[in-house]
Amino acid sequence: RWEALVDQVISDIEQQFPLQQVIGLGHSFGSLLTLMAAYKKPQLFSQVIIMDPPFVIGSKAFLFEALQKLGSKSIEKLTPAAVTVKRRDHWESIEQASQALRPNRIFKDFDEQCFADFIACGLKSDSTRNGVTLTIPKHTEAEIFRTVPAWWWRTPRKAPDIPIHVLTAKDSHFYKQ
């Protein structure tokens, strides 16, 4: 699944910016995809900026990979997957979704325009249940969390010859690792 998503990032860049390099910018899951795309096709990027990447490193990576291969349910507790599948994913209207999501700890500090952009892009019409739902189904998102590539960081490869900047908040889970 991850390789297909990396290929999608590459394809989007090649289609939208065919004659120029881009600055790769990603947060969390997007940062890891952007970095993986830069390793795969460095000529597309002038530099990469990744924020709070979900790296699984060190001894945790070995354990994480073993649990993945064994199909262990423990992965649910080590990733946001368990919370994701329990999350509400349907509202009667965009307005109801906006009112329900705004106080959430993830969104409460979002800039107004950023939150409006999330609502515009993160929700879609749900004709099956009448109303709106998440653009990316929660079960798809959970599967992505379950399959974070722990092995990727130990695979030998030449680093791209471009600047790569890693930003992380002091309070973030990734910084504390």
Task: Describe each PLM feature range.
Residues 19, 44, 107, 124, ...:
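A general structural signal for well-ordered secondary-structure junctions
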Residues 1-8, 89, 93, 147-152:
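Soluble or luminal CAZymes and related metallo-dependent hydrolases
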Residues 113-177:
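Conserved serine/cysteine hydrolase catalytic core
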Residues 60-128, 144-148:
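Helix-rich cap/lid subdomain of alpha/beta-hydrolase
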Residues 19-65:
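Conserved hydrolase catalytic core segment
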Residues 4, 8-12, 36, 96, ...:
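Alpha-helical elements of Rossmann-like donor-binding domains used by nucleotide-donor carbohydrate transfer enzymes
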Residues 1-25, 67:
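Active-site loop/oxyanion-hole signature of alpha/beta-hydrolase fold enzymes
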